[in-house]
Amino acid sequence: MLHYAVVFFVIAIIAAVLGFGGIAAGAAGIAKILFFVFLVLALLSILGGVFRK
């Protein structure tokens, strides 16, 4: 349990450094693009599974 606490603490510190360092704006733009790319891929995968049967 202590291992997970340390891992999450390190992740929180990294997120804080990136968030307060100004990198968040660029990462948010990339995240929006990736969201729509993976949304389209998920829909294609679902439709492929439906029509395959």
From Swiss-Prot:
Localization (cell): Cell membrane
Keywords: Cell membrane, Membrane, Transmembrane, Transmembrane helix
Membrane topology category: Multi-pass membrane protein
Subcellular location, principal: membrane
Ranges annotated as spanning the membrane: 5-25, 30-50
Cited InterPro entries: DUF1328
GO CC terms of this entry: plasma membrane
Family: Belongs to the UPF0391 family.
Protein's name in the database: UPF0391 membrane protein BP1737
Species, as recorded: Bordetella pertussis (strain Tohama I / ATCC BAA-589 / NCTC 13251)
